[in-house]
Amino acid sequence: MRALTPAEVLFDGETPPALLPVCDHYAGSEKLMLKSLALQAQLGPVFDVTLDCEDGAAVGHEAEHAELVASLIGGEHDRHGRVGVRIHDFAHPHWRDDVRLILRAAKRAPAFVTVPKVRNVADAAEMCAFIEATRREFGIEKPVPTQLLIETHGALAEVFRLASLPTVEALSFGLMDFVSAHDGAIPDAAMRSPGQFDHPLVRRAKLEIAAACHAHGRVPSHNVSTEIHDMSVVAADAARARDEFGYTRMWSIHPAQIEPIVSAFAPRDDEIATASEILLAAQAAQWGPTRYRDTLHDRASYRYYWSVLRRARSTGRTVPEQAAPLFGDAAGAGPVRTQG
């Protein structure tokens, strides 16, 4: 009898929760876009690149900027198919043109479309529906995932409904706009660490977003760190986002931030080894209860350790060769450094 994999037995026939690269790096100008794509080609798909139409386009030149973005998606610099785009918000007159220009002209569909300044479910649903209709019109085979930016009172109030929209794969927190929306009631110290993790209203927002994502199998993506010189601050921000708030992805706005973010979200070597040993024993036991170092394990803990191995692969960490069958790989295939 063939050994069953974790994905086949641990989720009761449902699709395992979404897993995306743990870092989402933003670039708005052509120069920065090309530098970001070159870095992604070098490091591999351990981080996404988001080409920014919202903040990247000069006023009056939105179409030209969208055409630039389209020319890079699926082009020679897009080696891994992990390039997304942020379009303009619902109130901006050019958001539909962003979608049409990019989906029509890009050599392949973007990995995702990020929608900023979401105000309510109705607006988000309309934008998602337009993206879906446009990809069908242009003969794009698969749906284009959407990622919603939660940075308004209205979006936070409806965050669980937003997470349930069919094409949504991730929710991101927009810290700066969220703090600014309180008209001075939240001090500017909450726009950076440690205030961004300690102020009660900001903590509440982050926790609500993470809870909504996990309830619906979406990915919670943490806001940027404004620190661009001391990377230990960035690493600490990423660690707090992961450990205290349940985030599994984080934005980057400077190339130097990518490595500390990826490292912070990656499992440690000892965690990977433990997860491999527990899951291999479980697989040998046909996924019944097992005992590991005087601790009992069952399918609930197996799901946790499976998430460790999936994150290890998605962050480029080496998974022990003997654990390859857990992923359905041929034994002896060696470590795979792509998304799990």
What are these regions (language model features)?
Residues 1-340:
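Expand to "…catalyze enediolate/carbanion chemistry for C-C bond making/breaking, isomerization
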